[in-house]
UniProtKB/Swiss-Prot annotation:
InterPro entries reported for this sequence: Cupin_2 (IPR013096), PKS_Associated_Protein (IPR052044), Polyketide_Synth_CurC_prd (IPR016672), RmlC-like_jellyroll (IPR014710), RmlC_Cupin_sf (IPR011051)
Disulfide bonds: none
Gene from which the chain derives: schB
CDD domains, alphabetized: cupin_TcmJ-like
Superkingdom: Bacteria
Domain Cupin type-2 positions: 42-108
Pfam families xref list: Cupin_2
Renumbered residue ranges of the record's region Disordered: 118-138
Cross-referenced SUPFAM superfamilies: RmlC-like cupins
PANTHER family found in the cross-reference section: 16.7 KDA PROTEIN IN WHIE LOCUS
Family named by the database record: Belongs to the SchB/CurC family.
Name under which the protein is recorded: Protein SchB
Amino acid sequence: MTEQQARIVAFDDVPPNRRRGGDVRALLTPTTAGATSGFMGVAVVRPGERISEHYHPYSEEFVYVTAGAFEVDLDDVPHPLRTGQGLLIPKDVRHRFRNTGDVEARLVFHLGPLAPRPDLGHVDTEETDETAPAGVVS
């Protein structure tokens, strides 16, 4: 029997993170849910908005689009991604998401395994209006 408990976390329970563009909310994490092998969240991106380029040196990222349409750049190569499609982003692959439609777009993401420390899990490679200088690890 496991000591870990099931945990439900609502979208509105987590404050938005807008530092990289969009409204990104990490819902099920080590902090919010006691996760031990990865974390899951949701991103909401308005038309014309983007999530800035970054990569994950320790984790694969699994993405599923629940609404709208994106263009995702994978190491500078653009790929269309629409409602009902999933995407696997291998570790160390630079990626950014742009909402190419005229309605709000939403995606669910999961990253695993976890980095040794949270500050090592995400490397920014470009600035947005709300980010620190490029190359800052967060």
